[in-house]
Regions:
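Hydrophobic alpha-helical scaffolding
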Residues: 151-152, 206-208, 248, 313
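Acidic, glycine-rich segments within the central catalytic cores of soluble metabolic enzymes
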Residues: 167, 171-238
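C-terminal active-site/capping subdomain that shapes the small-molecule cofactor and substrate pocket
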Residues: 230, 242, 246-334
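N-terminal Rossmann-like NAD(P) cofactor-binding subdomain of oxidoreductases
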Residues: 1-199, 301, 325, 332-334
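Short, solvent-exposed beta-strand edge segments and adjacent coil->beta transition regions
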Residues: 144-145, 201-203, 240-244, 306-308
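Generic secondary-structure signature for well-ordered alpha-helical cores
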Residues: 22-26, 163-171, 181-184, 211, ...
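Short clusters of hydrophobic/aromatic residues that line enzyme substrate/ligand-binding pockets
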Residues: 66, 131-133, 147, 188-189, ...
Length: 334
């Protein structure tokens, strides 16, 4: 039986998630979407995508549905998520991807309306648990975890690398920088924004800004709580990012040891989440790669017990694939 999913917010992540489910063949059925945009526009943006290209299916919009390849998705335009009839639609899991309801005290309205589980596609507040697939999914408890955060795309890239380094060499402390594609939260032209750096034209600047990814690591790897920090440099590309992590470990190591540890994890317990390459790639090469982290072995640097590693990630596509994986995980025990 398919896991029935409702999506609240059909923006970049909502639409990427729809495409990731369609491409993966996972037993997930998206039965309803809520978005304040009109249906014709939503259908058009699902069919035509500047990064992912054109959907090879017929996409039609009616007043209350979008039909893709003959399959209907119910569409609502409710400003108040408390009015969404998830229970009546038999929705098992709601993906909360508006960016507006990242506080579980607000997101729980989906569960009150009949959804069995709610997954917030962002770092959250007051959530029951934050899960990064491949890192701490074993801590998921179906009996007590209803509102679940899938963390951020950057935490999903950072955590697998940090886990391997910590499990193998013991991280003492570290700093990270994500060289990150621009997002909807930046301005196309200079204009007002609460973050004066993000106020500036996204396609014309390297824009330093905050990321909670390093601090959030403690939510999924508790032994690293308070040991990592960092920031983001937003760069003028639409997707395809890289996390640069520098850590002090408990003993002196070599580049070969570090790369061997990551390669073993990528071919073993973290297969599909962490991938390993020795190719000399650039950001466009990892667009539409479903892994959370593509470890670039050629960039590993070591001085004594200090280690620098780099992992690439398609911040939209990789993350959307993890949403689908997390839904499969929670769908086992509904």
């Amino acid at each position: 039986v398919s896991i029935r999913v409702g999506v609240n917010g059909f923006g970049r992540i909502g639409r990427n998630f729809w495409r990731a489910v369609a491409a993966s063949g996972k037993d997930i059925e998206i039965v309803a979407v809520n978005d304040l945009t009109d249906n014709a526009t939503l259908a058009h943006l699902l069919k035509y995508d500047s990064i992912l290209g054109r959907l090879p299916y017929e996409v039609k919009a009616t007043s209350d549905e979008i039909t893709v390849d003959g399959k209907a998705i119910k569409v609502f335009a409710e400003r108040d998520p408390g009015k969404l009839p998830w229970g009546d639609l038999g929705v098992d899991v709601v993906v909360e991807s508006t960016g507006l309801f990242t506080d579980a005290t607000k997101a729980k309205v989906h569960a009150e309306n009949g959804a069995k589980k709610v997954i917030i596609s962002a770092p959250a507040k007051n959530e029951d648990v934050t899960i990064v697939m491949g890192v701490n999914e074993k801590s998921y408890d179906p009996s007590s975890h209803t509102i679940i955060s899938n963390a951020s795309c950057t935490t999903n890239c950072l955590a697998p690398m940090a886990k391997v380094l910590h499990d193998t060499f013991t991280i003492e402390k570290g700093l990270m920088t994500t060289i990150h594609a621009y997002t909807q939260d930046q301005n196309l032209q200079d204009g007002p924004h609460k973050d004066l750096r993000r106020a500036r034209a996204a396609a014309l600047n390297v824009v330093p800004t905050s990321t909670g990814a390093a601090k959030a690591i403690g939510l999924v790897l508790p032994e690293l709580k308070g040991k990592l920090d960092g920031f983001a440099m937003r760069v003028p590309i639409p997707t395809g990012s890289a996390t640069d992590l520098t850590v002090d470990v408990s003993r002196e190591v070599t580049v070969e040891e570090v790369n061997a540890a990551v390669k073993a994890a990528a071919e073993g317990p973290l297969k599909g989440i962490l991938s390993y390459t020795e190719d000399e790639i650039v950001s466009s090469d990892i667009v539409t790669d479903p892994a959370s982290c593509i470890f670039d072995a050629g960039l590993t640097k070591v001085i004594g017990n200090q280690v620098k590693v780099v992992g690439w990630y398609d911040n939209e596509w990789g993350y959307s694939n993890r949403l689908a994986d997390l839904i499969q995980l929670v769908g086992r025990d509904l």
